[in-house]
């Protein structure tokens, strides 16, 4: 057994010895695991894992869905319940004391969050060298990838998603928690397209009147006071980021963007952005309430909940603050199932009442997560299903059962587990269980094998899992003009191919950590906040050099993946004796031309400039220091009919209840579709392996060749309509342009 170490104040117990992780003392239940009848648990297991498959605790590891230099995220299946989860595996030996402190803070914060639109933490497992965070798996990937694949959203759909985001962020603020890294990459989607906010690695607790002074976040989403080096209360920086997110959902581009940090800083501090012609007046009005330069005049989320735009289509069901229901720890059905697994009623009660994030609590919570075939998901008022069937739902709940919650607060009479129905469609796969193996050795070994340099690990629990991988191209692109027809709306035709996507797509904002905070001089703006082409004072540069992060180009692309300028910053602490912030970086304004200019609030007062330092140079140099991509080696045997590296009991494709992300459909048998996909990917010169019966993991290019590296997955899924299958493409790493080209070629070869 691996030894367990103290994680943080709490009552966690590890999944093997039942030792208390949080308090550092052994539980009186310690020996019960070895003495418990393993046969009873094996016989009653809903799912199990073969001995040769890697596992961590009670979880069978399936595949990597995100990785970085110190951690990775694995898709896993809970052996006892068959539910899919995402496990973040962190190598503690690579972290300094400051990073460890932030990690423990992230865990502590996630333990206290219980909202249907926030990724749920199920279990914490810790060994001497490794920390495992077992979290909710959002199978539909990131909002970022959704926008890449579908283009901008119509306001009706953007409103449904944004209501969920506002509810979750307001819930965090009510608990005195500020996220500080809200962006499209950290907004995940479950199987029913409900929002799940992830990555609380930069979150912190705040107290009104006690200022925070750490500059962190993705620059295009960062509030102007962060660029100025000012201290802040906390919620106001999240509110600015929400405005950027809303603009991105509706327009498919960023309001503030550019080729380098200097341009980005100038654009943000000026507060100018273009309003596309298709944006409604009400949407423009709510944006003006978010994107206010003066944080004291920025709106509050309580005010936003009463805004006209956010409640259109929800008459009588105004968005209200989320009321957290009491945890249901007395579900006799789940307890009986767990007793059949071999747990005792005493340890179940102790774990649940003490809120220990151990295997007992995780099993109980996962048993309460409904499968796709039944039960509500999400809370009334915020689910996206309202976009598709408003007459059959109330306040956005996708099930007809939600009518009982009409015109009421979210989940006022439903339990937490009813709100968060699990997004896993996969059924159990019986096989012998081998619980005596070391529960963590395989995870630690894989972490060491696949560690990549130069990145902070993604905390994403999304299906695509591409955040942690370096992009194959360092090119930075700015936003296109949203007035142009090349920005597509999301297509309703599920059989259409990705050919309608623009040639250049969105740039992913990765996560970096900076040891110093960039300073900034305050901008000098006209009193009315308007641009003056002849005499508007420019923001003085923070450094003699601009450090361009993108090659010059006349055409700018929409939110392209892999930009260093859109990476998450984390600055050091600002000492009180410092006068202010300096240095900065800026962004070129998003759309270059539009008939309408957005308004902004009264500009910030001009401040006394102070000498700049070489901090900006250090910051930009750090961001532009790229590590050459090491293509992930896709191991395993060649795909043949006689050697398949999966459990043969999984003979049916995964069921997609909501096939909104499927581009290609066919009535062919799934086996025939897989054979056609293998031929098409081979014709496209892709290197593929088949980790699951109806899933291909593919690599193309890279390894010093002329073509950039592209890593993607192709899956054959069962659609709700009988006899109809869908082909689902998911990008894991690489540029959107290369991915789109490959998808188009493979789709054409399939001739569906």
From Swiss-Prot:
Residue ranges constituting the UBA domain according to the UniProt record: 324-368
Tell me which SMART domains the record gives: S_TKc, UBA
- Tell me the outcome of changing residue 214 to A: Prevents phosphorylation and activation by STK11/LKB1 complex
Q: What post-translational changes are documented for it? A: Ubiquitinated with 'Lys-29'- and 'Lys-33'-linked polyubiquitins which appear to impede LKB1-mediated phosphorylation. Deubiquitinated by USP9X.
Q: Which cofactor does it need?
A: Mg(2+)
EC main class here is transferase
Molecular-function GO term, any one: gamma-tubulin binding
Keywords for the protein's UniProt record, in alphabetical order: ATP-binding, Cell cycle, Cell division, Cell projection, Cilium biogenesis/degradation, Cytoplasm, Cytoskeleton, Kinase, Mitosis, Nucleotide-binding, Phosphoprotein, Serine/threonine-protein kinase, Transferase, Ubl conjugation
Q: Which residues form the Protein kinase domain?
A: 59-310
Task: List, alphabetically, the Pfam families matched.
Answer: KA1 (PF02149), Pkinase (PF00069), UBA (PF00627)
What's the effect of swapping residue 418 to C? In a colorectal adenocarcinoma sample; somatic mutation
Cellular compartment(s): Cytoplasm, Cytoskeleton, Microtubule organizing center, Centrosome; Cytoplasm, Cytoskeleton, Microtubule organizing center; Cytoplasm, Cytoskeleton, Cilium basal body; Cytoplasm, Cytoskeleton, Cilium axoneme
User: Which residues participate in ATP binding?
Assistant: 65-73, 88
> Regulation of activity: what does the record state?
Activated by phosphorylation on Thr-214.
Query: What GO CC annotations are associated with the protein?
Result: centrosome; ciliary basal body; cytoplasm; cytosol; dendrite; gamma-tubulin complex; microtubule cytoskeleton; microtubule organizing center
Reactions it catalyzes? L-seryl-[protein] + ATP = O-phospho-L-seryl-[protein] + ADP + H(+); L-threonyl-[protein] + ATP = O-phospho-L-threonyl-[protein] + ADP + H(+)
Q: What does the record say mutating residue 214 to E does?
A: Mimicks phosphorylation state, leading to increased activity. Decreases mTORC1 activity
Q: What is this protein called?
A: MAP/microtubule affinity-regulating kinase 4
Encoded by which gene? MARK4
């Amino acid at each position: 057994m691996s030894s367990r170490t103290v994680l943080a104040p709490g009552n966690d117990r590890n999944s093997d010895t039942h030792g208390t992780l949080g308090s550092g003392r052994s539980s009186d239940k310690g020996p019960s695991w070895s003495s418990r009848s393993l046969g009873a648990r094996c016989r009653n297991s809903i799912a199990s894992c073969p001995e040769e498959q890697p596992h961590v605790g009670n979880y069978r590891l399936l595949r990597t869905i995100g990785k970085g230099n110190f951690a990775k995220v694995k898709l896993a299946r809970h052996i006892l319940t068959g539910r899919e989860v995402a496990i973040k595996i962190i190598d503690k030996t690579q972290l300094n004391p400051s990073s460890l402190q932030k990690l423990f803070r992230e865990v502590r914060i996630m333990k206290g969050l219980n909202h249907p639109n926030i990724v749920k933490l199920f279990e914490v497992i810790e060994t001497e060298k490794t920390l495992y965070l077992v979290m909710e798996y959002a199978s539909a990937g990131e909002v970022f990838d959704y926008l890449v694949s579908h283009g901008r959203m119509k306001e009706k759909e953007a409103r449904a998603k944004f209501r969920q985001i506002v509810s979750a962020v307001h819930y965090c603020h009510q608990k005195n928690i500020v996220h500080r890294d809200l962006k499209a990459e950290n907004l995940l989607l479950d199987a029913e397209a409900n929002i799940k906010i992830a990555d609380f690695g930069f979150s912190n607790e705040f107290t009104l009147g006690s200022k925070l002074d750490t500059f962190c976040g993705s620059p295009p989403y960062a509030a102007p006071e962060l660029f100025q080096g000012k201290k802040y209360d906390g919620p106001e920086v999240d509110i600015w980021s929400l405005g950027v997110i809303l603009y991105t959902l509706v327009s498919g581009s960023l309001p503030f963007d550019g080729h380098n940090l200097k341009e980005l800083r100038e654009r943000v501090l000026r507060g100018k952005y273009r309003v596309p012609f298709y944006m409604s007046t009400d949407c423009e009005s709510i944006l003006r309430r978010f994107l206010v330069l003066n944080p004291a005049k920025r709106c509050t989320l309580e005010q936003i909940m009463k805004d006209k735009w956010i409640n259109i289509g929800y008459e009588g069901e105004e968005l209200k603050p989320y009321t957290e229901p009491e945890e249901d720890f007395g579900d006799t059905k789940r307890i009986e199932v767990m007793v059949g697994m071999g747990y005792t009623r005493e340890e179940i009660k102790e774990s649940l009442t003490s809120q220990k994030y151990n295997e007992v609590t995780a099993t109980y919570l996962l048993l309460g997560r409904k499968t796709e075939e039944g039960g509500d998901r999400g809370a009334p008022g915020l689910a996206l299903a309202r976009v598709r069937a408003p007459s059959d739902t109330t306040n956005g709940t996708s099930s007809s059962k939600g009518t009982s919650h009409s015109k009421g607060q979210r989940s006022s009479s439903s339990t937490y587990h009813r709100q968060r129905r699990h997004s896993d469609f996969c059924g159990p796969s019986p096989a012998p269980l081998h619980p005596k193996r070391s529960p963590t050795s395989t995870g630690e070994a894989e972490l060491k094998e696949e560690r990549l340099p130069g990145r902070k690990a993604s905390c994403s629990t999304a299906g695509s899992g591409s955040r942690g991988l370096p992009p194959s191209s360092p090119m930075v692109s700015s936003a296109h003009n949203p007035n142009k027809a090349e920005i597509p709306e999301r297509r309703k035709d599920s059989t259409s191919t990705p050919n309608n996507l623009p040639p250049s797509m969105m740039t992913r904002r990765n996560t970096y950590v900076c040891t110093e905070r960039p300073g900034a001089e305050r901008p000098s703006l006209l009193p009315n906040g308007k641009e003056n082409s002849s005499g508007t004072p420019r923001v003085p540069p923070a450094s003699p050099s601009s450090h361009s992060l993108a090659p010059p180009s006349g055409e700018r692309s929409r939110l392209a993946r892999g930009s260093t300028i859109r990476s998450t910053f984390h600055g050091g602490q600002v000492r009180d004796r410092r006068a202010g912030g300096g240095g900065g970086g800026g962004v070129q304004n998003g759309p270059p031309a539009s008939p309408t200019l957005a308004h902004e609030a009264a500009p910030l007062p001009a401040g006394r400039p102070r000498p700049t330092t070489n901090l900006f140079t250090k910051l930009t140099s750090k961001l532009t220091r790229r590590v050459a991509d090491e293509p992930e080696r896709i191991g395993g045997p060649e795909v043949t009919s006689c050697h398949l590296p999966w459990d043969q009991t999984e003979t049916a494709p995964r069921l997609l209840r909501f096939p909104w992300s499927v581009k290609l459909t066919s009535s062919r048998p799934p086996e025939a579709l897989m054979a056609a996909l293998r031929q098409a990917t081979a014709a496209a010169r892709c290197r593929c392996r088949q980790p699951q019966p109806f899933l291909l993991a593919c690599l193309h290019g890279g390894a010093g060749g002329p073509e950039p590296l592209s890593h993607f997955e192709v899956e054959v899924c069962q659609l709700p309509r009988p006899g109809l299958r869908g082909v689902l493409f998911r990008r894991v790493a690489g540029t959107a342009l290369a991915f789109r080209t490959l998808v188009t070629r493979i789709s054409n070869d399939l001739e569906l």
